[in-house]
Amino acid sequence: IVPFDPNKVIPCCNGWVLAPYPNRVTNGQYSFDGEDYQMPIDEFDRQSSLHGYAYRYMWELVDLQESHVTLSWRSPDIAGYPFDITITATYALDENGLTETFTVHNNDSVKAPWAFGIHPWLANGKHATGQAITADNEPCRLELHCDTHVTVDEHLLPTGEEPVSGIFDLRDNPTLEGRGF
């Protein structure tokens, strides 16, 4: 677990909660329940709306204990997302490691579209960027138990999924050498 200065922006999207949608929305446009919505474009080079709004706002501290912390975020009336949801996140640390638990509650009587993701970031204790961080990470190992991964197009928008293989196969605790993560 890497601490950050609470008064500075968290680098590299580290640990961001991605809601009410993860990834990207093409041109910031979507339709839900017969209505069309327009969100601000904030990823200009890809003309998309990126990673939702939850990471952009302060979260309320609900509970702080030695072994865990619980935070909540209630969506304000946001351009392109006029829905009222609350997300609660609990981060608990024990002898088995870190457990993250998230719940979402719709505070309104109308349906609310939402999706969820997290933006994990692996830190090797060094503060390099670009090719230097790639070189520092290559001897590290990562084990991830999954059978498929999401495929993306040139704008990093999801196009489907396929079985893990080659650089995407992390089931046997390989080094990250040549994987470019």
Language model regions located:
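Beta-strand secondary-structure signal
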Residues: D36, H68-S72, T88-T90, T99-T103, ...
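Residue-level marker for the onset of beta-strands and adjacent loop->beta junctions
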Residues: T26, I87-A89, E138
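Extended, loop-rich substrate-binding clefts of extracytoplasmic carbohydrate-active enzymes
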Residues: P40-E95
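Beta-strand-rich N-terminal accessory domains
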Residues: I1-M39
